[in-house]
Amino acid sequence: MNIKDIKKINFFISEKKNKNIHLIGIGGAGMMGIALILLKLGYKVSGSDLLESLMIKKLINLGATIYLQHSEKNIKNVDFIIKSSAISSNNKEILAAKKRNIPILLRAEMIEILMSFKKGIAVSGTHGKTTTTSMIADIFIDSGLDPTVINGGLIKSINSYAKLGSSSYFITEADESDASFLYLNPNIIIVTNIESDHIDHYDNSFKKLKQTFLTFLKKITLYGTAIVCIDNNAICDILTNLKCKIITYGFNKNADVRIFLYKQNNFIGHFYIILKNNKKLNIILNIPGKHNALNAAAAIALAIHEGINNDLMITSLKNFQGTCRRFEFLGFLSIDQGFDKRANCMLIDDYGHHPTELSETIKTIRISWPNKNLIMIFQPHRYTRTYNLYHDFVQTLSQVDVLLILHVYSANEKFIVGADSLSLFNDIKKLGKNYVTLISNHNMILDTLIQTLQGNDIILIQGAGNIDTIAHKILIKKTKKVIK
């Protein structure tokens, strides 16, 4: 889409009462935020998806018309369409829209239109985008700056994926999975890290992935700012090519915003931030893990850059409630083991689906609860990711005490030989790990769990597919209510 197209679209969507915007894949994490903002702005919003969810019900209550199927009938009175990156070009609604010459926008193109004439802040990176965006949103809201926010996960403090604000600030998560973040033109870009993921979209070239991040960063004008994690080698490789202002953060002693003396106690992270002027900030973070300290450091670097009061920022981080499905403590699950015995297990839900994310979650649990029996229920996400990172998955998954592995959530990808859960199961067993079970039927989960409980257990629900829905249905509904 070129500048003329954007001007044209901006022109006709300004007539809010007469135009209908249709979102295909409206239930996706990246799409719900856009739908919420459009509804708040007064547009007519419709959408389609295959599964109902609490967020879809919320959108309906706000006035959206949502169809739980894909059909060309859904776009009968539509003026233009926004499509999720997960939607195929062969989708019935996409094909019908092309026949009728209805404009079709990608998610990122719509965000760019919404962000026009605002001070755009984009949070990008392989890991940590959603949590970092949530922290930034909380800091700006608590500081009275009233930003507009679009996030890829539910921000607990506002119980939403998005918020329409009255100020000039527009904060958004920027998706690198299909390089669509290149449509954005923010004033400030945060890059949390660059690792091999979604590599099939980059011709299986990590070099091309890094180059795409560099292209994104080069979109910052001389008056803009890049805030980047100096601990990440791939980021350091591309920094010399930037001409804008650069602020670095990390554990590295050369960071502009440096993390120092990190400690962890249960769900609390404690560390100091050392600034270039040697000023020291005492940070207490309401979520554990060094990776979350890095996420907080990115938010701190931005807050300082924007002149936010340090005390307000520190208080906001201390009160940070977290993000849905990001190391989310659900409570204690009481499971009947028979013979009047019950096991009370800590239940943690986590969206991580990349070996690095899994490894960080495991490390975090081992630091705070070293003697707990760690049981992971894992659902691999995408055959391409499993194939490209197969060895890393085998090594990382072998680090837990008990592993229940579900079949791969394909996300509409075709099966790849050797990148399935049975292959993972067999190769983990070859390492001499006898605690791994392949879950071929979801009804096996509870019985398998009962056999592995030791009385000091942590159950970790891990993955990005529909594992949270499965686990909640199988575990929570068939056991005693979770007690926090």
UniProtKB/Swiss-Prot annotation:
RNA-binding listed as a keyword: no
UniProt xrefs under InterPro entries: Mur-like_cat_sf, Mur_ligase_C, Mur_ligase_C_dom_sf, Mur_ligase_cen, Mur_ligase_N, MurCDEF_pg_biosynth, UDP-N-AcMur_Ala_ligase_MurC
Residues binding ATP: G125, T126, H127, G128, K129, T130, T131
Superkingdom assignment: Bacteria
This protein's UniProt keywords: ATP-binding, Cell cycle, Cell division, Cell shape, Cell wall biogenesis/degradation, Cytoplasm, Ligase, Nucleotide-binding, Peptidoglycan synthesis
One GO-annotated biological process of the protein: regulation of cell shape
Function: Cell wall formation.
Name of the protein: UDP-N-acetylmuramate--L-alanine ligase
Organism whose genome encodes this protein: Buchnera aphidicola subsp. Acyrthosiphon pisum (strain Tuc7)
High-level lineage: Bacteria, Pseudomonadati, Pseudomonadota, Gammaproteobacteria, Enterobacterales
